[in-house]
Amino acid sequence: MQKWQIELYSTPSWLLQTLLMVAAASAVILFLARETRFGREFAYILRLCLTPKSAVKVLLLITAMITLLLTEVRLNVLSTFMSKGLYDSMQDLNASAFWMFAAMNAGVVLVRAFNNVVNDFLDQGLAIKWSERLNEVLTTRWLADKNYYRLQMRRHAPDNIDQRIQQDAQDFIASTIEFVRGMVNSVVTSLEFAVVLWGLAGILTVFGFDIPHGIVWFVYMFVILATFIAMWIGNPLIRYNYENEKLNGDYRYSLIRVRDHAESVAFYSGEQHEHDQLADRFKAIIRNRWRIARQSVCLSGFNDMFTNGIKLFPIILQAPRLFAGQIKIGDIQQTVQAFARLQNALSFFRLFYNKFTAYRARLERLYGFLLSTEEQHSAQQPDITEVSDDLSLENVALFRHNGEILLSGINVNLKSGDSLLIRGPSGCGKTSLLRALAGLWPFGCSGKVSRPPHQDILFLPQRPYTAQGSLRDAICYPDIDKQHPELIEAMNTCRLGYLVDKLDKPDDWQHKLSPGELQRVAFVRALLSQPKVILLDEATAALDEPTEAMLYRVLKQKLPDSIIISIGHRSTLDQFHDGSTHVGNIDCN
């Protein structure tokens, strides 16, 4: 039995044995990687994405992908034997053998093409499923426990969270699949073609010393040396790529700010200022890109020089044996193919290193964001007791981010139907007190708070938020019945009747409506949701005094049992509240 026949018939057993060895090696590597920073960060994200229900499916999918990958390696090995037979048959002028090996080469090509198509489909399937799960984890963590709000209040908040959730997550998944596939392919190919090349190699004489199978030692030595040099050249790219993600996110955020505040910029004629700001941010991107370009050129230049420079070596090293009649043209062809496969496999990490630096940066950004969502619970919070109707604050104190006291000695006791007006200089903590009442103050708060459940508290800010979609979606945000029977009546009451015919029209209502219209939308929400506590933070600042008076009277008439707490500076607000309190002192700023 010829060697190509032995290799062909042993393929099924080889696949099974190699699959088991890959599984065992992967388990050992994952166990050892736990002690490295990279391994801990990767394992942390992986644990979040795997559930007991999905783990079995994922394991089966990965097993199928690895099996197809090993099949590809085996086909590459068989291809070298088929090519050897093809060239040997031409040298021997054996037509029947030539056509047999030509047919077998064609068969290998067809099987490889089918294998690659299925493998590519499984790759994309895993990427899509993983993307769904990781996106769910990231958005859930971001929106849980008001993290989306608290994170932006931190001094060292993660930058460009939207970019981390959308772009970094997708790139991380794609790079992980590419990296794992490349590593498995590299290791298995290195072992397989080292065996093939070992059988083809003769004695290599260097400076009078005979080295058996010298061509194998030659390729290993040179590729390992080149890998260490490439890592040394490319190491700064890890830092540069991390900075590149941050700078691009900052620039995109600046562009969005101009779009979202276009009217204010136009009123101020601030185009030049915005242009200068954007130019400065973009210059920072360009400076960093030049650093990346210089380092990448050095790395790619070295890689190209090594990859192309080593191609002739297998022919040069085997030529003396061909001229001596020890081997045939087919052996030379198989040597060239095996040498190239082995060199590429051993060079995987060297060639992938540039991508790995960007991959490492994305992993750190995702890990940093997820970790920050867990750290939010460390700040001291008041003792909150949920009651049915009343609201009270007992000895409540608020702290700044550095631990200094912002407010202290706050005592309030309000019954159902009571109303309170809070006054005080700007920056003294009036809005912060409302945040603490809603459980949103991120820097620490002490004391005792008794209030209705969170779903019975409605906050009306100075510039209300509207959801994307139709005007009906905007008004009924977040969970008011969109077919509420009193919706149109409430709109008419709040002087928004002229918008009734646009209720189901999709638009950017956050920017379409004026500040005064947005504030009236907030009052419509209050009338429809009928909360037990209404917190108004200068919620009528954009309205004229007659409209303000009308809206407060409507609240009192329609929601007589609701507790109303307002922050405002107008003296006209006094008549709509049972009492007022002053927050802050001369040192509050």
Task: Name each region found by the language model.
Residues P464-D508:
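Conserved "ABC signature" C-loop
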Residues Q170-S175, Y240-D260, A266-F313, K355-A358, ...:
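An intracellular "coupling" helix at the cytosolic face of ABC transporter transmembrane type-1 domains
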Residues G234-R239, E243, L247-Y251, A266-G270, ...:
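Cytosolic ends of transmembrane helices, especially the final helix of ABC transmembrane type-1 domains
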Residues D92-S96, G125-I128, L138-I165, Y251-Q277, ...:
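Short intracellular "coupling" helices and adjacent cytoplasmic loop segments at the cytosolic face
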Residues M1-S79, K84-N105, N119-D123, Y149-V187, ...:
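Membrane-integrated ABC transporters
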Residues T67, T71, T80, V111, ...:
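A hydrophobic transmembrane-helix motif
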Residues A436, A474, K505-N589:
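ABC-family ATPase nucleotide-binding domain "signature/switch" substructure
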Residues A157, F267, Y367-L421, K448-P453, ...:
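Primarily ABC-family ATPase nucleotide-binding module
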